[in-house]
Amino acid sequence: MFFQLPWLPEFILRRRDWALLVRVLRNTSSPGVFSDPDLEQYKQSWGKRGALTAMLNWYRAALVRPSKFALDSEASRVKLPALLIRGKNDQFVGEAMARESLHYCDDGHLEMLETATHWVQHEQPAQVNTLLSQFFA
């Protein structure tokens, strides 16, 4: 609910050279995944005008504005093939949530990468690329 506040999250996240966001990336990823140069690049991106608010607005909208489609309606179904790649050690998207997401897909597939976290594309890019190539083939 913290992100629902109008300006305080932006203020706090910018403090101390983005220390909280840097800590989140480092503490929720495998060691060494986000190097100091990577984090400097992230800080530059976060600092661009409107970028941080845009990041937070996704969470704000997801919690405040219910979807115009009921989750059990035909309009809410994903009819195209869908692939969800999840790290087994993801601290943000639980395994149950990932599996339940497939119930909204006519042709959904879940790939669990044993040693990855939420940042699966950063931690195991070759494996993610292989899975995507196979999926789109």
Please identify what each model-predicted range represents:
Residues D107-A137:
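Catalytic active-site module of serine/aspartate enzymes centered on a nucleophile-bearing elbow/loop
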